[in-house]
UniProtKB/Swiss-Prot annotation:
It comes from the Bacteria. It holds the Pfam family SlyX. This is Protein SlyX homolog. The gene is slyX. InterPro entries: SlyX. Coiled coil: none annotated. Belongs to the SlyX family. HAMAP family: SlyX (MF_00715). Residues 53-72 are annotated as: Disordered.
Amino acid sequence: MSKNSLEERLAELEMRLAFQDELINTLSDQVAKQEMDIRELWDAKKMLHKQLKDISPSNIRREEEETPPPHY
């Protein structure tokens, strides 16, 4: 192989490495943002679940409030 060919291959590999580094950083930032979004959505879901429980009490009575079945 000629010296010029090796230099071209090395330059190509360096460009690919730089591109991959940039891509990894971009993907890492995106994953971090999505993790924050998921946490926010999870917190909102918990809050909505609590609000729903507070405004619509269950129609199911607790066991001690239930009358025993007729066969007892």
